[in-house]
């Protein structure tokens, strides 16, 4: 099972942080259209259950905690202009224990970094834990996103 090597996180220090490209969209709100992902990876019940087990040891999804109702993505397929249509998914996560989550001043996904020539298909996920000397604590509003896609209106390029 996915979790067995990782269960020591729950018995380790409370200030644990687990982050990276986990390739799991935690909920349907983390993909542009849940219907487009039926039968695909990243959204299966088994994957989501494994992620929920990891979070159950006391880890907070700090980006979703900061932007609970916002459409924020960290990955867009290169094919079919998915980025420019904002047809993405949020599969890059920062999960933090209580002491770290309490220090989060700002958390966001830098969509601008995904633009330009030769970018990664992922955008950086950034968390500010402390206020900078100049008072900067990151964006107070999430980067603008397109409106929610009508369910079933778009297909994945590989579908």
What is the predicted function of each stretch?
Residues 13-28, 32:
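Acidic/histidine-rich, metal-coordinating catalytic segments
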Residues 27-159:
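Metal-dependent phosphoester-hydrolase catalytic domains
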